[in-house]
Amino acid sequence: YLQGVGSNKWDPNYTWGRQVIPPENVKSLEPKLFVKREKGCLAVKKLSKKLPLNEFRLMNFKKMNGNSLDNLDINSYLLRMGREEGDYRYFIVYDNYLNILSYNCSNYYGLSVGLLSDKFK
């Protein structure tokens, strides 16, 4: 199914996404990042607006090892998972993640597939 459904095609040159460390001011950034979406399933509606990865880098989101995100101009979205403040986990996801969601539109499913696939690299 990773070959794509409809307009969502898997790009083997990129990954699905990654967990990230948010900047200290993430709460103040969220109103600008998360805008109401009219289209898409619930999982897609929970993604931030689309931004180039280098914009998340400029906002000081970091890789889990503390290094800066890559300075790339690829479509990226922020995903916030968790039930309450202080319990949130943040992920930067790419167009390949949307391909996963086109098969089963659940962020729990998408993250499970993505994180499990990382174990096989």
Regions found by a protein language model. Name each.
Residues 1-7, 13, 27:
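Acidic/His-rich structured neighborhood in mature extracellular/periplasmic domains
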Residues 16-121:
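C-terminal soluble interaction/assembly domains
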